[in-house]
Amino acid sequence: MKNNAQLLMPREKMLKFGISALTDVELLALFLRTGTRGKDVLTLAKEMLENFGSLYGLLTSEYEQFSGVHGIGVAKFAQLKGIAELARRYYNVRMREKSPLLSPEMTREFLQSQLTGEEREIFMVIFLDSQHRVITHSRLFSGTLNHVEVHPREIIREAIKINASALILAHNHPSGCAEPSKADKLITERIIKSCQFMDLRVLDHIVIGRGEYVSFAERGWI
């Protein structure tokens, strides 16, 4: 009863002020629903965030880290992984609706939902039509912890097949640092030059790290 009573507080706050009014602790408590023996759900949520540093750190943790620190079992671990997967699928659906990309933030959030937590480098491309509406997105290449082999001709072949007019490139850095390497810059230049011959525009290349990102377009590199 104590857990349920304390959980009602963030619920009441949400109903009165909206979901965005909740703190990270309160939002996490809503999903956890119950605490553990001798620890109410708000206290548990606060301790979890303190141990992992942020929601990002918590949602990308492995089970061994999770249970080792908190000892609260596989059920709550599954709940949290479910939250992350739900967010990923939500953005996946939004990007399939053929609507124009509303903002750079929407694009970044989608890419973070797709690439965060991957243990290998993944190279993705978002294919757009002439109105910059999403046609599709695809994980075209996957590599190792710190390298992925990218072939511009494969990107162009896919773009021609689906009649794309513009592209957004993206890949992740499993190390966590989003700063582009020299190799990242070189492959971007190669892709841009190859696309120019086919009248394809590369709008951006976004590198996703751990809780951070770098946009080539924002830095003026594209």
From Swiss-Prot:
<keyword id="KW-0862">Zinc</keyword>
<dbReference type="InterPro" id="IPR037518">
    <property type="entry name" value="MPN"/>
</dbReference>
<feature type="domain" description="MPN">
    <location>
        <begin position="100"/>
        <end position="222"/>
    </location>
</feature>
<dbReference type="InterPro" id="IPR010994">
    <property type="entry name" value="RuvA_2-like"/>
</dbReference>
<keyword id="KW-0645">Protease</keyword>
<feature type="binding site">
    <location>
        <position position="173"/>
    </location>
    <ligand>
        <name>Zn(2+)</name>
    </ligand>
</feature>
<dbReference type="InterPro" id="IPR046778">
    <property type="entry name" value="UPF0758_N"/>
</dbReference>
<comment type="similarity">
    <text>Belongs to the UPF0758 family. YicR subfamily.</text>
</comment>
<dbReference type="InterPro" id="IPR001405">
    <property type="entry name" value="UPF0758"/>
</dbReference>
<keyword id="KW-0378">Hydrolase</keyword>
<dbReference type="InterPro" id="IPR025657">
    <property type="entry name" value="RadC_JAB"/>
</dbReference>
<feature type="binding site">
    <location>
        <position position="171"/>
    </location>
    <ligand>
        <name>Zn(2+)</name>
    </ligand>
</feature>
<keyword id="KW-0479">Metal-binding</keyword>
<dbReference type="Pfam" id="PF20582">
    <property type="entry name" value="UPF0758_N"/>
</dbReference>
<protein>
    <recommendedName>
        <fullName>UPF0758 protein YicR</fullName>
    </recommendedName>
</protein>
<dbReference type="Pfam" id="PF04002">
    <property type="entry name" value="RadC"/>
</dbReference>
<dbReference type="InterPro" id="IPR022820">
    <property type="entry name" value="UPF0758_YicR"/>
</dbReference>
<dbReference type="InterPro" id="IPR020891">
    <property type="entry name" value="UPF0758_CS"/>
</dbReference>
<feature type="short sequence motif" description="JAMM motif">
    <location>
        <begin position="171"/>
        <end position="184"/>
    </location>
</feature>
<feature type="binding site">
    <location>
        <position position="184"/>
    </location>
    <ligand>
        <name>Zn(2+)</name>
    </ligand>
</feature>
<dbReference type="GO" id="GO:0006508">
    <property type="term" value="P:proteolysis"/>
</dbReference>
<dbReference type="GO" id="GO:0008237">
    <property type="term" value="F:metallopeptidase activity"/>
</dbReference>
<keyword id="KW-0482">Metalloprotease</keyword>
<dbReference type="GO" id="GO:0046872">
    <property type="term" value="F:metal ion binding"/>
</dbReference>
